[in-house]
Regions:
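Conserved beta-strand and immediately adjacent loop positions that scaffold enzyme active sites
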Residues: 41, 115-118, 155, 162
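Extracytoplasmic/periplasmic helical hairpin
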Residues: 2-31, 147-149
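Extracellular/periplasmic ligand-sensing ectodomains of membrane signal-transduction proteins
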Residues: 12, 16-19, 32-99, 104-112, ...
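Residues that line or immediately flank small-molecule/substrate-binding pockets and catalytic motifs
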Residues: 46, 136, 160
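Extracytoplasmic/secreted envelope proteins and their assembly/folding machinery
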Residues: 22, 26-30, 87-90, 118, ...
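Intrinsic low-complexity, intrinsically disordered coil/linker regions enriched in small/polar
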Residues: 139-175
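Conserved beta-strands of PAS-like sensory domains
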Residues: 110-149, 167
Length: 175
């Protein structure tokens, strides 16, 4: 678990404080992504019950080689919590109360097959504050798996938590 403490100045509304806090941490979030091989997207998003629906940081590359560009974050007010396709990256880790790897998927906006790692953030009293996450070009991981050798003729492969194959040079994904 990741715990974060917000020390809100007296008189500042919580929704306004999220925006002020974002200004303070935005560069650190971007630097973290800029120093992570294969990072395509990085985000810090706040619980929409306590913040503006587009508050936080969202930065994305248009290709693996391009610069991160800050964009307007997803508007939470446009989606129901059960809409896994659009906001599952936020609600699934919060509900699990632990960091999770999302299943690999094709991001149609940038045409990159990617995997997401998302960490929920909680206050000391257990209240959900938000999430911090990163989407990574899945080929960065599969290339590492392909380069791994086991003894002289063995090789590595990648499975998910249920044992389904995510990457194997001789077997189709999902078997």
């Amino acid at each position: 678990r990741v715990w974060i403490v917000f020390l809100r100045p007296l008189g500042l509304r919580l929704k306004d404080y999220a925006d002020t806090y974002t200004e303070t941490v935005q560069q650190a979030v971007l630097d973290f992504a800029n120093h992570t091989n294969g990072a395509v997207t990085v985000y810090l998003r706040y619980n929409p019950n306590y913040s503006n629906p587009t508050s936080g940081v969202f930065a994305q590359r248009q290709s693996v080689d391009s610069e991160l560009q800050c964009l307007t974050p997803t508007d939470f007010s446009m989606y129901d919590e059960s809409d896994v396709e659009h906001v599952g990256w936020y609600y699934l880790p919060v509900q699990a109360k632990e960091a999770i790897w999302m299943s690999p998927y094709m991001n149609e906006n940038v045409n990159i097959y990617m995997i997401s790692y998302v960490v929920p953030l909680f206050a000391e009293d257990g209240t959900s504050i938000g999430v911090v996450g990163m989407d990574i070009d899945f080929s960065q991981i599969t290339d590492l798996v392909d380069e791994t050798t086991v003894y002289q003729s063995g090789y590595a492969f990648l499975t998910d938590a249920s044992g389904s194959i995510m990457h194997h040079k001789n077997v189709d994904e999902g078997t």
